[in-house]
Amino acid sequence: MRSSWIKPRLGKDNVTQINFARNGYITEEMDFVAKKENLPASLIMEEVARGRLIIPANINHLNLEPMSIGIASRCKVNANIGASPNASDINEEVEKLKLAVKYGADTVMDLSTGGVNLDEVRKAIIHESPVPIGTVPVYQALESVHGSIDRLTEDDFLHIIEKHCQQGVDYQTIHAGLLIEHLPKVKGRITGIVSRGGGILAQWMLHHFKQNPLYTRFDDICEIFKKYDCTFSLGDSLRPGCLHDASDDAQLAELKTLGELTRRAWEHNVQVMVEGPGHVPMDQIEFNVRKQMEECSEAPFYVLGPLVTDISPGYDHISSAIGAAMAGWYGTSMLCYVTPKEHLGLPNAEDVREGLIAYKIAAHAADIARHRAGARDRDDELSHARYNFDWNKQFELSLDPERAKQYHDETLPEEIFKKAEFCSMCGPKHCPMNSKISDESLDQLKDKLEECNSSV
């Protein structure tokens, strides 16, 4: 679909959506997104130009169906997949991708760290993906030197970053906000640094006693990104890994640097979103969202969770979906899903499904709370189907039709019960909705009550 769109842009110094928008040009991607979001294309262009909305769309990802992330559009959900040294293979990761797309992932991140050829798994995922693909290049940078921090050079980081761009990665998590002077602020935390990318860079800085190379070479990375229209996802290396560490000096010091880097990326006309926590008590979520908007000049916010309790291993998708719904309500643009395996192991296909559905609920709830146009239409349609006992319509409109039908059919499997005016909870005699009170009866009752009141 995008080949004809991209061809005229080839060879230009800057092919980013924000560059076109700032020059008053509505790209095919902007027009496509406008139709998906039911918004004017002119508004999409204005929001992209302002930096409040991004369209992650690498020019080498030709089978991509463009989408947007930003406060003007629907709240989006990202799903993480990826192989590890201990589990998974390329075919399994491609199947996870397909499952994630099936259940509504708006973007997918390949977080592979080993166990497979990282280039091959990434190519396979991009080739199969209609949604934007994100990566964390420092993982492969470390893998390329067989885990030896002392052998990892600044140029190694940039080489891997450009390789990901060439392969069609739409956005990359760049942990450029972690500075060497931030590291002492981690003292006193319970869980220290929980970001894998942040941990790698912290070790690099401590070993070489030098500033973060992703910070010192940030302008070079911008020059790479604008050739491919790769989007920055500025990583939060010091995100809190537990409630105790939330909103501390370390996190907020890095956030200030992320704001500086956001504006530097915009100076190069490169798209950017900013990543956020993590583990945050419910009463601090609004503060975290507002603080990011203030420090980062309203660049789209992309949060992991946040989890609102630390005692839910095995159920962290529930704990975090609570925080995610609140974050979305307060203005977060994209929610990174958490699966039931979070903190416990590598998620399988079923974990991907469970995590995604939990987060689609959270994002949808946020859109309803923010009064986005049409956000509640599907809910109202399902409610009408429920009141009319249209079981098949209820299944069809649900976020997970297969699960809804499975649960209904566990107790009433025969096809005749798809027309029944009850389920197994109340049975035929006690369901309040199958004894429908007509509007006419209610009007008559209202008239009688008014007569009684007027005669008193």
Swiss-Prot record:
Any Gene Ontology CC annotation: cytosol
E.C. designation(s): 4.1.99.17
Binding-site positions, substrate: N80, M109, Y139, H175, S195, R196, G197, D236, S237, L238, R239, E275, Y302
Pfam family, one: ThiC_Rad_SAM
Keywords: 4Fe-4S, Iron, Iron-sulfur, Lyase, Metal-binding, S-adenosyl-L-methionine, Thiamine biosynthesis, Zinc
Cofactor note: Binds 1 [4Fe-4S] cluster per subunit. The cluster is coordinated with 3 cysteines and an exchangeable S-adenosyl-L-methionine.
Coiled-coil annotated spans: none
Residues holding [4Fe-4S] cluster: C423, C426, C431
Pathway: Cofactor biosynthesis; thiamine diphosphate biosynthesis
InterPro entries given in the database record: ThiC, ThiC/Bza_core_dom, ThiC/BzaA/B
Reactions this protein catalyses: 5-amino-1-(5-phospho-beta-D-ribosyl)imidazole + S-adenosyl-L-methionine = 4-amino-2-methyl-5-(phosphooxymethyl)pyrimidine + CO + 5'-deoxyadenosine + formate + L-methionine + 3 H(+)
GO biological processes: thiamine biosynthetic process; thiamine diphosphate biosynthetic process
Cofactors: [4Fe-4S] cluster
One GO MF term: carbon-carbon lyase activity
Residues that bind Zn(2+): H279, H343
HAMAP family from the UniProt entry: ThiC (MF_00089)
Assigned protein family: Belongs to the ThiC family.
Task of the protein: Catalyzes the synthesis of the hydroxymethylpyrimidine phosphate (HMP-P) moiety of thiamine from aminoimidazole ribotide (AIR) in a radical S-adenosyl-L-methionine (SAM)-dependent reaction.
Entry protein name: Phosphomethylpyrimidine synthase
Organism: Prochlorococcus marinus (strain MIT 9312)
Record lineage: Bacteria, Bacillati, Cyanobacteriota, Cyanophyceae, Synechococcales
